[in-house]
């Protein structure tokens, strides 16, 4: 079980939005709703360290999030935040149902076949709309794209740090 004090990267400030100090956020969480319940965010400073800022409002805007911070009401107040990463404490994230995971819990898992063959490390997740696709780096330059489907992903064990998959026939030949 993860500690409530653990920080997780959930997005990045991609731009300002309007002139009233709002920020356009690219979400890395895979779940837009996780932003809606946030009370505060931590924004990474250029030299390291974190700055905790109170959230006034977060709302979906297409595939982005529009984030308003308390005390920031003008575009000039937030220009310096563009390009920075956004983190949250684990205890601020909504609880998920069984079989659901935050991307930050999946990244870094060792991916193996049901026969025990190690495919590599899950290094990225691509959101395609219909289903996510897991990017797994094997040895060398080998990259495997695995669809995140119930009949492909057999087991996820975040405590043990592994994911077991049943690859569609011919996937490794691509």
From Swiss-Prot:
It comes from the Bacteria. InterPro entries: PRC_barrel-like_sf, PRC_RimM, RimM, RimM_N, RimM_N_sf, Transl_B-barrel_sf. Residues 97-171 form the PRC barrel domain. One of its GO terms (cellular component) is ribosome. One of its GO terms (biological process) is rRNA processing. The keyword Ribonucleoprotein does not apply. Keywords: Chaperone, Cytoplasm, Ribosome biogenesis, rRNA processing. It is found in: Cytoplasm. One of its GO terms (molecular function) is ribosome binding. Signal peptide: none annotated. Disulfide bonds: none annotated. NCBIfam families: 16S_RimM. An accessory protein needed during the final step in the assembly of 30S ribosomal subunit, possibly for assembly of the head region. Essential for efficient processing of 16S rRNA. May be needed both before and after RbfA during the maturation of 16S rRNA. It has affinity for free ribosomal 30S subunits but not for 70S ribosomes. Belongs to the RimM family. Binds ribosomal protein uS19. The PRC barrel domain binds ribosomal protein uS19. This is Ribosome maturation factor RimM. It comes from Geotalea daltonii (strain DSM 22248 / JCM 15807 / FRC-32) (Geobacter daltonii). The lineage of its organism: Bacteria, Pseudomonadati, Thermodesulfobacteriota, Desulfuromonadia, Geobacterales.
């Amino acid at each position: 079980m993860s500690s409530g004090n653990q920080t997780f990267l959930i997005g990045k400030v991609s731009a300002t939005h309007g002139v009233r100090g709002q920020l356009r956020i690219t979400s890395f969480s895979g779940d837009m709703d996780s932003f809606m319940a946030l009370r505060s965010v931590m924004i990474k400073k250029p030299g390291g360290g974190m700055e905790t800022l109170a959230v006034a409002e977060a709302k979906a805007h297409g595939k982005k999030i529009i984030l308003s911070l308390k005390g920031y009401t003008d575009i000039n107040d937030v220009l310096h935040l563009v390009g920075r990463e956004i983190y949250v404490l684990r205890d601020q994230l909504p609880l998920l149902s069984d079989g659901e995971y935050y991307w930050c819990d999946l990244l870094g898992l060792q991916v193996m076949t049901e026969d025990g063959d190690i495919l590599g490390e899950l290094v990225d997740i691509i959101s395609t709309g219909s289903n996510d696709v897991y990017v797994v780096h094997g040895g060398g330059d080998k990259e495997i794209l695995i669809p995140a489907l119930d009949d492909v992903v057999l087991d996820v064990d975040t405590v043990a740090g592994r994911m077991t998959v049943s690859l569609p026939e011919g996937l490794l030949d691509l």
